UniProtKB/Swiss-Prot annotation:
PROSITE patterns documented for this protein: PABS_2 (PS51006)
Keyword Kinase among record annotations: no
Binding residues annotated for spermidine, in chain numbering: 62, 86, 155-158
Designated name of the protein: Polyamine aminopropyltransferase
Designated gene of the protein: speE
Domain called PABS: residue spans: 2-237
UniProt cross-references to Pfam families, sorted A to Z: Spermine_synt_N (PF17284), Spermine_synth (PF01564)
PANTHER family noted in UniProt: SPERMIDINE SYNTHASE, SPERMIDINE/SPERMINE SYNTHASE
The protein's role, per its UniProt record: Catalyzes the irreversible transfer of a propylamine group from the amino donor S-adenosylmethioninamine (decarboxy-AdoMet) to putrescine (1,4-diaminobutane) to yield spermidine.
Catalytic activity: S-adenosyl 3-(methylsulfanyl)propylamine + putrescine = S-methyl-5'-thioadenosine + spermidine + H(+)
Organism of derivation: Lachnoclostridium phytofermentans (strain ATCC 700394 / DSM 18823 / ISDg) (Clostridium phytofermentans)
Length: 283
């Protein structure tokens, strides 16, 4: 008998992967956490039935959410990461010796424990001495912070359930206050392709542009995500993601990456027309 995991991309679209086995299933205080082993995509993290990351293509997501701002801002030392319980974003950040401190805020401690055991390819740097973990709501943690961070990365799940508060104008306003005068905010921006998701893209972009003087969107292709077309938000108090890109400096670091490069960096901000139209009234 064959086993298949099916991710519901929309009410009319599904994405199925042939499974080897279910490795673990845990019901935390906030959600159900599953890790499955698949033939094509390796290990897969599933929250409340929704696919979050896969072993095969997680590197795309984590490199794009991390290295884009790191190649723009000239002096990132203190970083706040909200979400990221799987550890992939932390793994990418710890490649930079210049980063001095990372606050990681994850509401669900159980995700971290499960990923440490079953997804070491993303959780491998959670014990880095520069990382401080805080198990609480990101919205609550950032509230009241003033002028503390060079970079904030919002690496959260979809805009419902435990992560819903991380897509509000109040949250983005608090992030603005928590950043230094030249700080950058990066958030995962969902997919613009399906109508069921495009409203979330518009809403997040509207809230961010109301707060930050410079706000734009960049894209990448993640095969296991709904439609494969995924967006990230880049919001900044000072730096332009293309004009202020220091490709020479970044390339001299010779970091081990599989997807991101500085040529791709320049191109990922050039959006297709349908995305421009979707976001146009808020640019």
């Amino acid at each position: 008998m064959e086993l298949w995991y099916t991710d519901q991309h929309t009410k009319d679209v599904r994405f199925s992967i042939k499974m080897k086995e279910q490795l673990v299933s845990v019901e935390s205080e906030f959600q159900r956490i599953d890790i499955i082993e698949t033939y094509e995509y390796g290990r897969v993290l599933v929250l409340d039935g929704e696919m979050m990351i896969t072993e095969k293509d997680e590197f795309i997501y984590h490199e794009m959410i991390t290295h884009v701002p790191m190649a723009v801002h000239p002096n990132i030392r203190n970083v706040l990461v909200i979400g990221a319980g799987d550890g992939g974003t932390i793994r990418e950040l710890t490649k930079y010796d210049t980063i001095e401190h990372i606050d990681m805020v994850e509401v669900d401690k159980e995700i971290v424990q499960v990923c440490r055991e079953y997804m070491p390819f993303t959780a491998c740097k959670l014990n880095d001495k520069r990382v401080s973990m805080h198990f609480e709501e990101g919205l609550r943690f950032v509230r009241g912070k003033q002028d503390e961070y060079d970079l904030i990365i919002v690496d959260c799940a979809d805009p419902f359930g435990p992560a819903e508060g991380l897509f509000t104008r109040e949250f983005y306003g608090n992030c603005y206050k928590a950043l230094h005068d030249d700080g950058i905010l990066i958030n995962q921006h969902e997919s613009p392709f399906y109508n069921e998701h495009s409203g979330s893209v518009q809403k997040a972009h509207r809230h961010i542009t109301a707060v930050f003087p410079l706000s734009t969107v960049y894209q990448c292709h993640i095969p296991s995500y709904p439609s494969g077309h995924w967006l990230f938000g880049f919001a900044s108090k000072k730096y332009d993601p293309i004009k202020d890109l220091n490709d020479k400096k970044w390339n001299e670091l010779k970091l081990p990456v599989r997807y991101y490069n500085t040529d791709l960096h320049k191109g990922c901000f050039y959006l297709p027309n349908y995305v421009k139209e979707l976001l146009g009234s808020y640019e």
